[in-house]
A protein has these predicted regions:
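N-terminal amphipathic/basic-hydrophobic helices that include classical n-h-c signal peptides
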Residues: 1-19
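Hydrophobic N-terminal alpha-helices or hydrophobic patches in metabolic proteins across all domains
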Residues: 21-308
Length: 308
């Protein structure tokens, strides 16, 4: 904590010196000094927030599902930049960049100072907002297209929220996926049952035609759902003239699309399992996973880029 406060004070001093230099409008010496002060301000912010970046990195490494959504976010950002000829330039401060950096400092250190009073959820929200604002600040300094930077920053903020939801919603998502899958399978098979095996690590099992199937963590659909949400967020935020409510509805609807397609994946796997046998089960398990993931991405792209 003391390190954070020291970095905070040091960065505040740097920013005040920078603003004074700008207002004094002195020759090139002050301009060069201001230039390296900009970099120091960003370095201080990055150093202060490095534990959060490390935690996010560890979460991505530990979770294949979270890794999928992160890859989708990065690839979507690159594709948008390439398709709209958005190119980075040498970093430099602007009023918008400075505002975003100040917001990052205020949110991040506000979370550290008021964490005990706010509670864990508001503290995490403030912390992640601060980290996202820092990324927006760096983006505004490196890109001229503000809409692109804000779209990526907003999608990244949603990704940070998903990073803490990956374990919280594991069991509820498995239950929901199992219920919808059982409902669809019951249309074709009279002997469908869904069971919950309680214990230190609760499990969801499905019995179809006398055969039992485990709805494991990999089947909870978090990977496809989070990827749909992140992809929809960056596309709708960048895409234009829709209202905030419509954009929010599209993002939520994209998550619902991911949930439905994940349930259909489970149905497809169970339907093919008796024919595939034990040796072919894993192949079809993975094949249907990739197929429905690709379908979900295509549907979300179509939905998010559709003209209002």
């Amino acid at each position: 904590m003391r390190i954070f406060f020291c970095l905070h004070r040091f960065a505040a001093l740097i920013l005040s010196i920078y603003i004074m230099d700008e207002n004094e409008n002195k020759p090139d010496t002050n301009a060069r000094r201001a230039a390296w002060l900009e970099y120091v301000a960003w370095i201080c912010a990055a150093a202060a927030m490095s534990p959060v970046f490390y935690w996010l990195g560890a979460a991505v490494v530990d979770s294949q599902q979270l890794r999928d959504s992160f890859i989708i976010l990065v690839v979507a950002g690159i594709v948008i930049a390439m398709s709209h000829e958005i190119r980075p330039h040498r970093p430099h401060f602007s009023a918008d960049s400075l505002t975003a950096l100040c917001a990052a400092y205020a949110a991040f250190f506000g979370a550290q100072i008021l964490g005990d009073r706010l509670g864990i959820i508001p503290t995490l929200l403030l912390t992640f907002f601060g980290v996202s604002a820092f990324i927006v600040s760096a983006g505004l300094a490196c890109f001229d297209r503000k809409r692109y930077v804000y779209a990526f920053g907003g999608a990244f903020f949603i990704f940070t929220l998903l990073s803490i939801a990956v374990r919280i919603f594991d069991l509820p998502l498995r239950m929901l996926a199992g219920k919808l899958s059982a409902l669809v399978l019951s249309l074709f098979n009279d002997t469908v049952g869904l069971y919950m095996m309680k214990g230190s690590d609760p499990q969801i099992a499905m019995n179809v035609g006398g055969a039992s199937y485990l709805v494991a963590t990999e089947c909870n659909g978090f990977g496809i759902i989070s990827s749909c949400i992140v992809l929809s967020a960056i596309l709708t935020f960048f895409g234009g003239s829709r209202s905030i409510l419509k954009k929010g509805a599209i993002v939520i609807g994209s998550g619902l699309i991911g949930y439905i397609l994940n349930s259909l994946r489970i149905v497809s796997i169970i339907a093919v399992a008796p024919l595939a046998g034990e040796k072919g089960y894993f192949y079809w398990h993975e094949a249907f996973g990739y197929f429905y993931f690709a379908v979900a991405m295509l549907v979300v792209i179509r939905l998010s880029r559709r003209n209002p």
